[in-house]
């Protein structure tokens, strides 16, 4: 089976690291299983690292995860073998694209990266999923 490259939205990865099993937990787990099996290769915009770190730090501070869970999440992230992508988007262009796609700025970075590279995106975010349908970007 060929390996498929895809863009990993933080909304999916957050489900891997935080307890509670939100509405996208089953989907997120299926993505992780395919990554672990070597079927999928995750790519992320550089923004992903900042978002995930921020979520994990806040979860630890708010006592939603323990120090042990924080450390195990760090080990898991290092083991993902992520391909980090950088696309050029200045703030003015990001505002224009966000308005065009009806997305928040952060979500636009994920969506625009997948669109430019013509790779599918794994996301739980409703706005990103809608933009994918409207603008022809493949959802994983």
Task: For every predicted segment, state its role.
Residues 15-17, 55, 131:
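Residues that scaffold the ATP/ADP-binding catalytic core of kinase and kinase-like folds
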């Amino acid at each position: 089976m060929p390996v498929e490259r895809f863009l990993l939205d933080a909304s999916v990865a957050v489900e891997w690291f935080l307890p509670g099993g939100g509405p996208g937990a089953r989907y997120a787990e299926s993505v992780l299983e395919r990554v672990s099996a070597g079927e999928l290769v995750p790519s992320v915009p550089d923004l992903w690292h900042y978002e995930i770190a921020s979520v994990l730090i806040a979860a630890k501070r708010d006592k939603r995860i323990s120090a042990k869970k924080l450390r195990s999440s760090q080990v898991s992230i290092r083991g993902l073998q992520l391909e980090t992508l950088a696309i050029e988007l200045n703030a003015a262009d990001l505002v224009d694209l966000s308005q065009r796609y009806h997305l928040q700025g952060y979500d636009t970075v994920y969506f625009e990266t997948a669109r430019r590279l013509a790779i599918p995106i794994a996301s739980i975010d409703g706005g990103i999923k809608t933009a994918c349908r409207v603008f022809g970007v493949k959802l994983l």
